[in-house]
C-alpha cells in the first residue's frame, strides 16, 4: 500500500497561527487519504509544523472533520466538509461526487421522481453535500439522514433514471481509477462514457 503524500507546502509562515495550520490540515485531507491522527501529525511534521495530539484533535473538531468508512467496510479516512455554493458545470464538483459515489454508495432504490441512495452509517450528509455541490441539472435537491439520501429528480427525469445515473457514476469512478485513458467526456445523462476505442488492441 502506498503511503499518503502531503499536499504542496505553502511555506512555514502560513502555518504560524491556528488558521494557517488548519488551512494546511484541510489541504492535506483534501489531497491524501489519512487514516489516523498520528499519520496526519507526521505529514504536518514533514512540512515543519509540529503539533500536539490535543491540538490536532481540537483542530479536527473545529474543522468539522469526520472519519468515514467506505462501502467495503475498510479503514476509515478523515474528510472535511466543503463550504461554499455549488458552481454549475464545473467538472471538479462532478468528479468529486463520482469518486465519493464509488467509495460510499451501497445501494439505490427509487419511487416516482425520487431516488434513494444508501451509504455506510454516518456518510449520507457528506455524500449529499457532494451531490448538491455538483449542481446536476437533473436534481432538484437532496435530504440526508444518517445512512440514507433522498434525491428529488427534476422533470422529465424519473427517480429510476436518477438512481441509475448515480450507480453509473460510482461504477465509472472505479474503472477510471484503474484505466483513466478509457473515458471521454459526454453530456449525456450518466456522466462519462467508456471510449470503446480503448478496448481495442
From Swiss-Prot:
Primary localization: cytoplasm
Matching InterPro entries: Arg_repress, Arg_repress_C, Arg_repress_C_sf, Arg_repress_DNA-bd, WH-like_DNA-bd_sf, WH_DNA-bd_sf
Sorted UniProt keywords: Amino-acid biosynthesis, Arginine biosynthesis, Cytoplasm, DNA-binding, Repressor, Transcription, Transcription regulation
Organism the protein comes from: Mycobacterium tuberculosis (strain CDC 1551 / Oshkosh)
PANTHER family registered for this protein in UniProt: ARGININE REPRESSOR
Residue segments, region Disordered: 182-201
GO molecular function, one term: DNA-binding transcription factor activity
Pathways per UniProt: Amino-acid biosynthesis; L-arginine biosynthesis [regulation]
GO CC terms in record: cytoplasm
Protein family membership: Belongs to the ArgR family.
One of the GO biological process terms: L-arginine biosynthetic process
Pfam families: Arg_repressor, Arg_repressor_C
Location relative to the cell: Cytoplasm
Function: Regulates arginine biosynthesis genes.
Descriptive protein name: Arginine repressor
